[in-house]
Amino acid sequence: ELSVFSTWAWQWSNEGDMLYTTLFLSTAEIKDEIRPHVLWQTKLDGKVSMKPVPVTNHVTGEKELFVQDDRHTVYLINDVGRVLWKLPLGQQINSEVYQVDLFKNGKLQYLFSTPDKMYLIDRNGNAAGRFPVAFKGKCEQGISVYDYDNNRNYRIFVPCENREVYLYGLDGKPVEGWNPQKTDKPVVSKVQHFRVADKDYIVFADRYRFYILDRKGKERVRVSSVFDLKPHTDVYLTRKGGQPVLVFAGKGGQVHVVNFSGQTETSRVEGLSDRFEMNIVDWDGNGNGDVLFTDGNRVLVTRLDGTPLFEKKMEAKTLGFPYVYRFSAKDVRVGLTDPEQNQLFLLSADGKLSKGFP
């Protein structure tokens, strides 16, 4: 019974074509112990090729898993590991899998994209509405979906290689009134929406420039600085000195901080390869963002100005993206994977591995 545990979390992992779900449990009596327990495993037709996505069954309220394999087949798996349906797509999903309410009746669908199309699938595995919708150019960054006012009037951003950023509604049609200028280069980040001080900001980057627009596609904040960004750049909203800022990484270990007046600061973390992964975490609980890196078998944390806070070499070959799990206000842990050795790590801020890991 879950009620006896003070903290619990789910983790999904895979080994080849096997998908596992694990439950981590922490009791008040054993505060520093998080116990992993494999609940079920399911065999797929191919190797898992994306991080499994927990989705809600709108009929029962239970959690299910949406996942894709390397044969480009997607699956919906219920809470005991049974495959409810599978659907071949022909391409790899490159966006998040969003649950949306097309008919505003409480019944949810799955919205996602591949480089050539976006799909809307109901919980029975059937296409919904006017979907799939073919893009006007390759969309390598994937779609982003936002419900500005929580009224189920969804907006779907589609950044394409033709330097256009398109905006669609859930009816599969372009939204009238959205008219941004072409970017200088193809977009290298997902399009993101942030609301700061009751203002909306549409944010994305190309190889050298950073764009901050309003909901109509007009420039809201001018960022004059020039950057050198990676092909897939993540942008984070966090705080520095108590003020909201946007943070993203460039090549050569550069960390760029942009405030909402368009001013920029850049620091450099020495010794990083161009294969590093980055996330944002409040490492020391002071209310400001810190930068969390994985690079090879190393985990590093620095302040936004580059001041080092933490570094540890793991017994791993190559660490993947560092996921942040907050079990309580003072208990932040980093979830790490080593795909080459099929290992999972859960690391606390004091550098210790949680019991049962890897």
Please annotate each region the language model reported.
Residues T7-G16, T21-P358:
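Extracytoplasmic/lumenal domain signature
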